[in-house]
Amino acid sequence: MSIRTLPVLLAITAGLAVNAAQAATTGTLRFEGLVNAGTCNLAAGDVNRTITLPAVKISDFDSSPFAGAHNFEVSADCESDIRNVTFLFTGTPSTGNGLIFNNTGTSQGTGLWLVHRTTPVSTIPANGTPAQRSRTVATSSNKAILPLQAAYHKTSGAITQGTLISSMTVAITYN
């Protein structure tokens, strides 16, 4: 084999290697994902909660339409991008006073008065529109805290001894 034929053989062999690389298949990788907004949930202790009011006497209503006020809070745990939480309360109004939530206990003439503890205090009416039954709170440190107060309240007729039992649903929306 002469030295002159070696470059020709190398050129032919190199061409074969290029053809082999060109014969490989190609593809496209596509990546998809979803970026969701943060979420908010009622705090675990507020999902199914019993709030016990202090015992009162019938005579406590002699000079006031309400008695036994008890402060408490309802809160929501939120992710860092949530700025505001709206709490919506829904329950059955009392037949004697539609602003007051119905008492299914044994005491007659009483219902539950729910108040947002602001200055001045603001009743959350059982028979109100959704806007009247809602309160919006800004989040702080990934939490929204709504300060509330509940109390026994006269409805109509004579007040009798017995229990006060009142239930409502709280739902939250957020942004």
Walk through the language-model features, giving the residues of each.
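Mature extracellular/passenger domains of Gram-negative fimbrial/pilin and adhesin proteins
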Residues: 2-6, 19-175
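Bacterial N-terminal signal peptides
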Residues: 9-17
